[in-house]
From Swiss-Prot:
SMART domains: WNT1 (SM00097). Belongs to the Wnt family. One of its GO terms (cellular component) is extracellular space. The lineage of its organism: Eukaryota, Metazoa, Chordata, Craniata, Vertebrata. Palmitoleoylation is required for efficient binding to frizzled receptors. Depalmitoleoylation leads to Wnt signaling pathway inhibition. This is Protein Wnt-4. It is found in: Secreted, Extracellular space, Extracellular matrix. A lipid is attached at residue 1 (O-palmitoleoyl serine). InterPro entries: Wnt, Wnt_C. Gene3D superfamilies: 3.30.2460.20. Glycans are attached at residue 86.
Length: 119
């Protein structure tokens, strides 16, 4: 008589927040690189020679992201001037971040609406 053993292995994704944190960390430490010919091969090397060479685990980029604060329709960036923002928020829609340090104007408005409330 023989015995049979079944072994099942699987991999699971870590929590989404953990994945996001790792990507953000890599983004913050990303290195701008350029293509250089070294001998007969082309290689990506840091644009700033003071930076250490990147590893396979590092995030690199060839051209910097556009300045999303400034309007650049060629790059498809509408800019942030004139947008409404949340004065009390410190998050993405907050005025401090959305207005890119240009300052902002506040305005208060009172809105009176008729509603079909039944009590």
């Amino acid at each position: 008589s023989g015995s049979c053993e079944v072994k099942t292995c699987w991999r699971a994704m870590p929590p989404f927040r953990k994945v996001g944190n790792v990507i953000k960390e890599k983004f913050d430490g990303a290195t701008e690189v350029e293509m250089q010919r070294i001998g007969t091969r082309k290689q990506l090397v840091p644009k700033n020679p003071q930076f250490k060479p990147h590893t396979d685990e590092d995030l690199v980029y060839i051209s910097p992201s556009p300045d999303f604060c400034i309007r650049d329709m060629k790059a498809g960036v509408p800019g942030t001037a004139g947008r409404h923002c949340n004065r009390t928020s410190k998050a993405l829609g907050g005025c401090e971040l959305l207005c890119c340090g240009r300052g902002f104007h506040t305005a208060e408005a009172e809105l009176v609406e008729r509603c079909s409330c039944k009590f």
